[in-house]
Amino acid sequence: MRKIKSKAFRSAKSMWFYIGLMTLPLLQFFVFYICVNFNSFLLAFRNIVLNSETKQYEFSWTIGNFSNWFTDANEIQLLRQTLKVSLKAYAIMLLIGTPLGLFFAYYIFKKLPGAMFFRFLLFMPSIIASIVLVTIFRYFTDYVVPEILKIAKISLESTLLSGKGTRFATVMFYNLFVSFGTSVLLYSNKMANISPEIVEAAELDGVNAFQEFFFIVIPQTFSTLSVFLVTGVAAIFTNEINNFSFFNYNWKPDTATLGFLMYYRTQKAKAEISQ
């Protein structure tokens, strides 16, 4: 009987400990995720109008925000345009950024000459503030690149960030460079956990670097790679590819994404309300 009571006491005590342990994270999830997003959901159905007589804002419930978005020809055209740019940016990051990140991580994993310096160089953009990097990059594209092209007897009609034909490519080049820090660090750390016996056995069997990378390293790293592949889909709707850092609130149709459109509209609405 005592053993049964003691076991029941320990069970109840463990249950209260578990409840106390889970209360804080569940409360944080409820307040900072469910409540915040529920409020955003309600705001989507609210209409804010300034009363010219009382000079006060009047609020009403409506579905006009959605009906205008999908019936207004200008809004549909804007949505298509920004979605196209977002898909292009996502495709570039997926098809170019991901393979390059894996190759760079493999270079560091094999401890080839300059691997540590290479790792520092790729991770540096994650340490320095974005506005500082953008300022340096703008000076480089505005002044250094034209001088280099002059030596090669190539002239530009405008700077790389000003010309419509070069603006998107220049912005994406910057985004590719600054995206390697976190991904390369995680890829290389995952590769470092690969059993040395597996690599040594493959080398004894005559596997070359190409085969080792694709048939040993990639499968062993796929758990980390899959996380980036899945979460990267959200970037289609949220990534603004540093539009604000480069162009502030100046709208550039060839680089504006869905993420920047949402940010642009939000700031515009705040400005209208504050006025």
What does each of the following model-derived ranges do?
Residues 1-12:
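Short, Lys/Arg-rich, polar N-terminal cytosolic tail immediately upstream
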